[in-house]
């Protein structure tokens, strides 16, 4: 079985994007942003809120908090 290698950051952002989970993003200057991730790449995150999009550079992000519990990994009980 070939296993894809994906870093934790991409896995997290892709999960919240697919599940449309609302996030709170804190920037390094203390600004608090909320919204849903619509897209991301190696350098930035596109955040949507109230019909408006914001492009946030990853180097400016301090912390990302999902607005609800989320599961990123499959449970290990079914694995043999």
From Swiss-Prot:
* Entry keywords, A to Z: RNA-binding, Stress response
Q: Which Pfam families does the UniProt record give? A: Hfq (PF17209)
What InterPro entries has UniProt attached to this entry? Hfq, LSM_dom_sf, Sm
Keyword hit for RNA-binding:
yes
State the PROSITE patterns in the record: SM
Per the UniProt entry, the signal peptide is none
Gene Ontology biological process terms from the UniProt entry = regulation of DNA-templated transcription; regulation of RNA stability; regulation of translation, ncRNA-mediated
Keyword Hydrolase appears in the UniProt entry: no
Any one GO MF term held by the record is: RNA binding
Q: Where are the transmembrane segments?
A: none
Quote a single Gene Ontology cellular component term.
Answer: cytosol
Query: Locate the Sm domain: which residues?
Result: 10-70
Task: Describe its partners and assembly state.
Answer: Homohexamer.
Give the family per the record: Belongs to the Hfq family.
Q: What does this protein do?
A: RNA chaperone that binds small regulatory RNA (sRNAs) and mRNAs to facilitate mRNA translational regulation in response to envelope stress, environmental stress and changes in metabolite concentrations. Also binds with high specificity to tRNAs.
Q: Can you name this protein?
A: RNA-binding protein Hfq
């Amino acid at each position: 079985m070939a296993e894809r290698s994906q870093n934790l950051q991409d896995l997290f952002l892709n999960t919240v994007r697919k599940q449309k989970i609302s996030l709170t993003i804190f920037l390094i200057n203390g600004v608090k942003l909320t919204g849903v991730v619509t897209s991301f790449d190696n350098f930035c995150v596109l955040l949507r809120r109230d019909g408006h999009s914001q492009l946030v550079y990853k180097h400016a992000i301090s912390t990302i908090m999902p607005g609800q519990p989320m599961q990123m990994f499959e449970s290990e009980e079914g694995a043999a």
